């Protein structure tokens, strides 16, 4: 008797962006929508900004499941009130760039216009890719001055030394009056 073997169906990937007024239950509703169609959350970022809740997630699943998620976004909008956009993408593994050094760049300063622009332009000029970036503004406990914090996870090409990156960040720190720390995530 001959055994039948089945090859696993290849996974498909989709980025889903959802934005709308913040309220309780949105994450539960969006993830239910995905699992009901056979898709899974691989990676996500979610935050309240002002009074709006934003969801950016990477969903995976068999091609038919991802097609159902794409096809039915109108149902998700009607059920949640969120503005929904989707875009097919490749697997995270196939996008990863070879030969990079993962680093974290932390910035602290008195808040003023142009901090993100100045840091991101310098990173771009050095050929460094921003993988994720988070910012926040807050009041200093005693003085009430508006402070700013930024943390960026970046991929530094092997051809760019950490000394070169630090030099580029030092120039931005000097011109913008920032405290910047560059830290490699590779131990050793």
Per-segment meaning from a language model:
Residues 2-188:
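A conserved regulatory-domain signal marking ACT and ACT-like small-molecule sensing domains
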């Amino acid at each position: 008797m001959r055994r039948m073997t089945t090859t696993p169906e290849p996974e498909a990937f989709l980025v889903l962006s959802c934005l709308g007024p913040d309220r309780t239950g949105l994450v539960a509703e969006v993830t239910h929508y995905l699992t009901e169609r056979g898709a899974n959350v691989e990676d996500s970022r979610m935050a309240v900004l002002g009074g709006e809740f934003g969801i950016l997630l990477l969903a995976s699943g068999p091609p038919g499941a991802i097609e159902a998620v794409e096809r039915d976004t109108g149902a998700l909008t009607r059920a949640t009130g969120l503005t929904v956009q989707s875009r097919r993408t490749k697997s995270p593994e196939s996008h990863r760039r070879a030969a990079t050094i993962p680093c974290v760049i932390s910035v602290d300063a008195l808040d003023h216009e142009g901090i993100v622009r100045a840091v991101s332009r310098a990173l771009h000029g050095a050929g460094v890719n921003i993988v994720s970036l988070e910012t926040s503004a807050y009041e200093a406990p005693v003085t009430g001055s508006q402070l700013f914090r930024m943390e960026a996870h970046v991929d530094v090409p092997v051809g760019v030394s950490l000394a070169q990156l630090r030099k580029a960040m030092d120039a931005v720190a000097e011109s913008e009056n920032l405290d910047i720390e560059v830290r490699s995530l590779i131990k050793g």
